[in-house]
Each structure stands twice: as structure tokens, then as C-alpha cells.
């Protein structure tokens, strides 16, 4: 049973689909998902399983779903669709510019292009209010107060008052109201400004009362930000606002862009950030006093813990350290207890995952030297010191305090869940005791908390969103060490783990409700499919099978495992046809990039055009084996480590599979491109290679600036993906030994280089440098440069062109094919 909405015309069909599991109602009875065609056309399905009815829409976004209704917007047509599940009706509201659905009050508020604002009961269709000449509208955080910003007058509606009171403001003292802050449990304040003053009004039973006025220009030369986007209440009496620097700084002269060696940062980028940076102001509405925390010439960031009435601040670029993605920060604390005076806490790593607070907790949490800590007035407490678990990726050199850690999640207000490499650790903030919550390492499992199980609170002036488990149970997704099996498990209020789903596939896009879970499963031989299951795991059903035309997938993927001479465990994926001919040898392509075993069950449509590597389906169907080894790193450096890993993998795989050793190709993109560049400079095992967007000279890359972000690439070399563990000048020999360009004379493998001429993530001149070095050395090298393309080719024609050329390159060298015309 289907309801179809009219469309303007037929959309060209393309068989390849991307499946997205979008929404699930709280009662689990309504599921919303969509598929995206190759031409970006979106087909949206809302399935009411309780009433056995499907609703089909096209190109909707900004979607909302509850137990009773669905809303979605077609922005191109300016249509708003409202589905009432009880009445089984679909209503279309046209010419909608903006909408808000207040489910608690059963009210739909929407604005039209004609500056009209309608308030309706969408279930009955009854129009409650119509306002004309309204520029915009805004709701309070709790959706109880509506501010209508008019050309002539402002109107305030209180949806929770007994009389649904309406306040009309004609005389605004040349003030335009722009912002509502607060809630019913605290207070409602209305903010606006004249040409030179900030005005704050407080809502009272009979209207608004002006409670605060202040000049926009402040005593430290800064000015109040009148957009009011960074405005919030700490409590009823403390209002947080933003200020901006009083004047615009300039890092350029009439003839030159000025870079100052003494600046903490790249001068033009620093100036741009400081001109846009907002610093915190605090207005005490009780004492009618403004606290101006502005520091001129500084890039200051803040974190406000609203419930605890605490402010943390730090100078973002104080420690000018390009060796880290997130330089250290020196953190200070302000609180009402100490009259908002600044108190230093300590120096921490500046990763947004490393330092955080929860509004429900008085503690500051931070990660330092392998362990999690919390800080309060009594000092610091180590949370995980006694845990038999690793909370960081030990493979990264000097990375114990940086980005590759997972954020803690608050659980039942008084407990903290911390994800380790395989396990989940529980710390009780009330008893200050920790324990293993889920021990994945015992069962060859790696557990992660399902994102949809986490409620994220976002407010202005926070380090990052406040993460808390939504509900009393914890849903976990797991995979085994080979990624050949994945599943879903739940930990109930009794703290007992129970498996719900286990599949030979890859699970993603998990949505949860009170009693139903929806999720997508895919495999190398099965296109993504949407399933639902109840929390007992007993009732499971297929909701939608994407790419249903793709049924004859005659390939297999296997994990090859071994121990090297040092007793270290190693792995590689081998992909092949299911019906290899006995006695026949097959050309092979080795695809490299970090760890590949996690891609075991990744589905690839044969229609996917891949320009930054290969579509393994198509190459297998064309008679190749595809080998994807895990790369492991040691102190010798990333290039040398990659050679060891690939050589070991090939020796193992060649003894198990019918590999034509005389016809093996190598390919990689980005970091895989670097690995490809280096590997062929150290071995003649490969007959040909394709490298896209790769680094060739670590020395020059260390000194390169990303022109898009205006951030130097040093951090990527020292402590991130290149894992060098030292800078260029202290470790010059190591940089030299891991730079492909230094071994151009050794390369005997024909190489195809690919880059986009707007790529500054890996500067495209790295490919040019390798091309010139190989050309100078008289080697076989060709290069494809695509104008206007970045790190990944996005233009459809360019993607197909690169994909076709890569295919013809491998056919020519590995299968004795005809020489391509473009060569």
C-alpha cells in the first residue's frame, strides 16, 4: 500500500544506489530511509509498519519523525510535507521558507517567501494565527516562547501560558529584538540593540521589562557582538555574550602579504582568525554588572559548564607547536565562587577529545600520558591508572596525548564510559571506582558504543558537544579482529551483556528506539540491506534490499594470517573470483593504505567509478587477484615499514594463491600513494604501479603549508600519519631514508602518477617532483594532472577518465594489452 506524491517529471534511472537509514520513531513503529541514485536523486520511504503503509517522497531533507507524524522539506520546490500516520494523510504546504514543528504543543510554525508566518495545528489543519510583514522568527530553547521579528512591530507568543498570551511591541526604542535566551525553569531574556547600545528585556507575566542597557563599545576596545549567536544563560542571573575586537587587523601591505616570524601561527591565517574570533562577556543580571574577559591581540577560546556555573578559558595558539595537530593549551578556570577571577589549572593537550566537561558533573576530564583523569578543587584523580586496557592507539609515535582517543560518555549521570582499544571501561564518579564494563579482548571482539545511543547537547561556548547515554541501556556494536563477523549487543540495567545480532558482514547506520533497532548490513558479496530487530534479538526482518539487481557476485574475500620472524601477527585481504581455474596463474594488484583488513566486508558496486584506486569487483571480474595487506610500522619510518609489510604479505600470499609473480601491480592513494612511491624505489617485485596524490619528498613536505587551511604540514610528519617521531632537523637521516625521491635512480617500475592541481592536502607538486626526478633519471613515468581538482577527483568526466586510464595502464603492463592511445 503506497502513497505517491506528484513529481514534475521522470528522473533518469541509474541502477546503483546508496542506502541511508535516516530515522526511527521512539515506539519503533515507523522507519524512514532513502536511497540516492548516481544522479543525486533521492527517493525517500516512510514505512508505517503498524498500519502496513508506505509513503514515498522525493528529494526531501530536514526531516523529523515522531510516533504520530513525519515532516520533510523539498527546498528546491519550497514544499513542506506533513504525514499524519493516524489519519494516513499527506499534506503539502507550498512556498515554505522555514518551519518549526513543536510536537509538545501540536503546532506547526512556518514562514513564507512573502514574509508571512503561519501557526497551524497540522493534525486538524486549523489555522491558529497568521502574521504579516515578519522578517524572521525564533524560538526559545524549550520551544515555549516564539519571537516574531517584524518590519514594524515585534510579537512575542507564550505557548505555555494559560491564555496563550501575545505581547505586541510597537515602541522598540529603535531596537530590533534578535535573540531569546533562557527557559521556563530559569528566565526568558530578549536581546536587541540600537546603533550604540545593548538592550536586555526580561519577560514577566504582563509583558517585558527592560533590565539592562550597555554601550556596545567596551572599556578594553572591544565591542559586543550583535548577532547574538553565542548567547546563553549560565543560570537565571548570568548571561553569556560574545564580543569582537574593536578594529580590523591587517596582515598585508599594499604590495605584500606579511608573514611575521614572531607570531604564534602563520600571520595571515592568524589575523583572519583573530578578526573573526569571539571572546566571552558575562552579564550579572542581578547586580547589573558586565564582566569583560577580553584580551586584545589574543586568540582566546572558552568552555562554559552551564549547570556548574564554571568557565574554562585558554589561548588557542599560546604554544606555537607545529609538531602536533592540536598544540597544548594552558587552561584557566573562572567561577562565581571566586568572583570570576582567573585561576590556572594546568597544561593539557588541545585535542577536542582530550579535554572536556559534562554539565551534569562538576569535574574537568582530560587525557594525559596514557590515562584519563578528572580535576576538581581537590586536585587531579587518575581514572584509568589501574585499568588493564589501552585507551590510545599505541602504533602512533608520541601520540599518547593526541587525537586517536575516543571521547568519554556520561552514563546514568554518575558514571563514565571510556572506550579502550577493545574494551569499554566504567568509572563510578560517586565511589571513585572503576571496572571493566565490557571485556572485548577476552572474546576477540572490539566494542564501540552505537552513536545513536548517545544524546549530544550542543550549546554556545562548549569545548565540544556534551555526550550522554540516551536511556538506561547501552547498545554496542562489535567486530572480531578479522572483521569477518560483526554484531550488536546490549548491556541492561543489570550490567549484563546480551547479544542481539551477529552477522557475517559489516554493520552500520544503527538506529534505536524503545523496543526496535534498525541497521544496515553489507558484505563483499551482498549489497547493503536495511534490517530491523527487536531488543530480544528474536524477531528480525528485512526492510529494504538496495541494488537488488546485483545478485551474481562471484567473488570471495579471505583473510590471510601469519606470524613474522619476530612472532608478530600480520594480516592481508585477498580478493579473487570464486571459480579460479586450477593450474592457471593470475596477474595481481596490490592495493596499499594503512590497515585494510577492516574493509573485509565493504561492498563495492561494479558501477562505482573509482579514480583514487581500483574498483576491486571489476578487476577481479577481469581476471585479476587483488591483495590488500595491513601495513605495520616501526622506528625505521613509514616507507621502510611499508616495504617490510608488503614484502612479507606477498611472500605469504604467493605461497597460497595462484599469483603470476611476473605480473604484479601496485597502487595507492594519498598516504597509500606515498607508500607506493617508496615501495617501488626499494624493490623490483612490481611490474608497474599507479600512485595518486602521494608524497615523494618528506623533507620538502615537512616545510609545506596547506594553502587551504594555512596550517603547516609538520604535525602530520612528526606525530600523526607519517609517525616520524622527530622533526626534520633532528632526524634528517630518517627523513632522507624514507623519501622516495632520493631513490629515483633505483626505480625500475613503470609508474603512473595522478594528482589534482588544486590539491593542497597533499601538495600536488609532490607528484611533479617525483615525475621530474624519475624523468631526469631516465625512468618510465607518466603523469595525469587534473585542473581544478582537489585531493579526490570529483568531476564525473575526470573520474571516469582517470579510472579508464588506470585500467588501460594495468591491462597494458600486466596482461600484455594494447598500448593505450593516450600513451
Where are these regions (language model features)?
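Predominantly five- to eight-bladed beta-propeller fold
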Residues: 153-166, 219, 230-232, 242-290, ...
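Non-catalytic accessory segments flanking enzyme active sites
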Residues: 278-279, 446-468, 477-489, 495-580, ...
Amino acid at each position: 500500500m503506497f502513497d505517491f506524491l506528484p513529481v514534475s517529471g521522470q528522473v533518469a534511472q541509474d541502477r546503483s544506489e546508496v542506502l541511508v537509514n535516516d530515522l526511527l520513531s521512539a515506539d519503533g513503529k515507523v522507519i524512514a530511509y532513502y536511497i540516492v541514485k548516481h544522479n543525486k536523486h533521492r527517493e525517500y520511504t516512510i514505512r508505517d509498519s503498524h498500519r502496513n503503509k508506505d509513503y514515498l517522497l522525493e528529494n526531501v531533507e530536514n526531516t523529523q519523525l515522531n510516533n504520530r507524524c513525519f515532516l520533510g522539506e523539498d527546498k528546491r520546490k519550497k514544499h513542506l510535507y506533513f504525514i499524519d500516520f493516524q489519519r494516513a494523510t499527506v499534506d503539502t504546504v507550498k512556498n515554505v521558507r522555514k518551519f518549526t514543528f513543536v510536537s509538545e504543543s501540536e503546532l506547526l510554525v512556518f514562514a513564507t517567501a512573502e514574509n508571512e508566518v503561519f501557526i497551524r495545528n497540522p493534525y486538524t489543519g486549523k489555522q491558529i494565527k497568521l502574521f504579516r510583514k515578519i522578517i524572521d522568527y525564533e524560538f526559545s530553547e524549550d520551544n515555549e516562547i516564539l519571537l516574531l521579528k517584524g518590519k514594524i512591530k515585534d510579537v512575542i507568543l507564550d505557548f505555555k501560558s494559560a491564555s496563550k498570551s501575545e505581547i505586541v511591541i510597537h515602541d522598540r526604542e529603535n531596537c530590533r529584538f534578535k535573540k531569546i535566551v533562557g527557559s521556563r525553569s530559569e528566565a526568558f531574556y530578549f536581546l536587541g540593540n540600537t546603533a550604540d547600545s545593548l538592550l536586555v528585556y526580561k519577560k514577566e507575566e504582563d509583558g517585558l521589562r527592560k533590565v539592562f542597557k550597555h554601550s556596545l563599545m567596551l572599556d578594553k576596545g572591544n565591542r559586543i557582538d550583535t548577532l547574538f549567536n553565542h548567547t546563553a544563560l549560565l543560570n537565571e542571573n548570568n548571561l553569556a555574550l560574545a564580543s569582537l575586537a574593536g578594529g580590523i587587523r591587517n596582515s598585508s601591505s599594499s604590495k605584500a602579504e606579511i608573514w611575521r616570524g614572531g607570531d604564534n601561527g602563520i600571520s595571515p591565517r592568524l589575523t583572519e582568525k583573530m578578526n573573526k574570533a569571539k571572546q566571552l562577556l558575562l552579564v550579572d543580571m542581578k547586580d547589573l554588572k558586565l564582566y569583560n574577559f577580553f584580551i586584545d591581540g589574543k586568540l582566546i577560546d572558552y568552555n562554559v559548564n552551564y549547570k556548574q556555573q564554571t568557565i574554562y578559558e585558554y589561548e588557542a595558539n599560546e604554544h606555537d607547536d607545529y609538531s602536533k595537530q592540536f598544540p597544548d593549551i594552558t587552561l584557566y578556570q573562572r567561577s562565581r565562587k571566586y568572583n570570576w577571577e582567573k585561576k590556572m589549572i594546568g597544561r593539557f593537550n588541545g585535542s577536542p577529545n582530550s579535554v572536556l566537561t559534562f554539565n551534569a558533573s562538576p569535574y574537568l576530564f582530560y587525557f594525559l600520558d596514557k590515562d584519563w583523569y578528572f580535576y576538581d578543587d581537590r586536585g587531579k584523580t587518575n581514572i584509568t591508572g589501574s585499568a588493564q586496557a589501552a585507551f590510545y592507539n599505541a602504533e602512533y609515535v608520541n601520540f599518547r596525548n593526541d587525537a586517536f582517543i575516543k571521547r568519554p560518555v556520561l552514563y546514568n549521570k554518575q558514571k563514565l564510559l571510556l572506550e579502550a582499544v577493545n574494551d569499554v571501561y566504567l568509572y563510578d564518579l560517586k565511589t571513585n571506582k572503576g571496572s571493566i564494563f565490557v571485556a572485548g579482548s577476552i572474546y576477540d571482539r572490539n566494542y564501540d558504543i552505537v552513536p545513536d545511543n548517545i544524546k549530544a547537547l550542543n550549546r554556545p561556548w562548549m569545548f565540544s558537544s556534551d555526550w550522554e547515554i540516551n536511556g538506561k541501556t547501552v547498545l554496542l556494536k562489535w567486530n572480531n579482529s578479522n572483521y569477518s563477523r560483526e554484531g550488536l549487543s546490549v548491556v541492561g540495567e543489570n550490567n549484563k551483556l546480551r547479544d542481539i545480532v551477529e552477522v557475517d558482514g559489516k554493520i552500520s547506520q544503527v538506529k534505536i528506539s524503545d523496543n526496535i533497532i534498525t541497521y544496515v548490513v553489507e558484505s563483499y558479496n551482498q549489497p547493503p540491506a536495511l534490517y530491523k530487530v527487536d531488543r530480544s534479538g528474536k524477531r528480525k526482518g528485512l526492510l529494504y534490499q538496495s541494488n537488488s539487481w546485483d545478485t551474481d557476485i562471484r567473488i570471495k574475500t579471505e583473510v590471510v594470517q601469519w606470524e613474522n620472524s619476530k612472532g608478530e601477527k600480520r594480516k592481508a585481504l585477498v580478493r579473487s573470483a570464486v571459480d579460479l581455474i586450477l593450474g592457471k596463474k593470475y596477474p595481481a594488484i596490490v592495493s596499499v593504505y594503512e590497515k585494510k583488513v577492516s574493509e573485509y566486508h565493504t561492498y563495492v558496486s561494479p558501477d562505482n567509478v573509482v579514480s583514487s584506486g581500483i574498483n576491486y569487483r571489476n578487476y577481479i571480474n577481469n581476471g585479476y587477484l587483488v591483495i590488500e595487506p595491513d601495513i605495520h610500522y616501526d622506528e625505521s619510518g613509514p616507507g621502510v615499514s611499508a616495504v617490510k609489510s608488503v614484502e612479507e604479505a606477498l611472500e605469504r600470499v604467493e605461497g597460497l594463491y595462484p599469483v603470476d609473480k611476473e605480473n604484479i601491480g601496485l597502487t595507492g592513494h594519498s598516504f597509500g600513494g606515498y607508500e607506493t612511491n617508496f615501495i617501488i624505489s626499494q624493490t623490483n617485485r612490481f611490474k608497474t604501479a599507479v600512485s595518486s596524490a602521494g608524497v615523494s619528498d618528506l623533507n620538502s613536505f615537512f616545510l609545506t603549508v596547506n594553502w587551504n587551511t594555512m596550517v603547516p604540514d609538520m604535525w602530520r610528519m612528526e606525530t600523526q600519519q607519517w609517525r616520524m617521531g622527530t622533526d626534520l632537523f633532528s632526524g634528517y637521516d630518517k627523513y632522507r631514508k624514507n623519501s622516495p625521491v632520493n631513490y629515483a635512480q633505483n626505480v625500475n617500475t613503470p609508474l603512473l602518477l595522478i594528482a589534482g592541481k588544486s590539491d593542497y592536502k597533499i601538495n600536488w607538486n609532490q607528484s611533479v617532483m617525483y615525475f621530474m626526478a624519475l624523468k631526469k633519471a631516465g625512468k618510465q613515468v607518466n603523469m595525469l594532472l587534473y585542473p581544478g581538482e582537489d585531493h579526490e577527483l570529483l568531476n564525473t568526466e575526470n573520474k571516469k577518465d582517470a579510472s579508464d586510464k588506470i585500467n588501460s595502464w594495468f591491462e597494458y603492463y600486466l596482461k600484455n594489452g594494447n598500448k593505450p592511445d593516450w600513451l
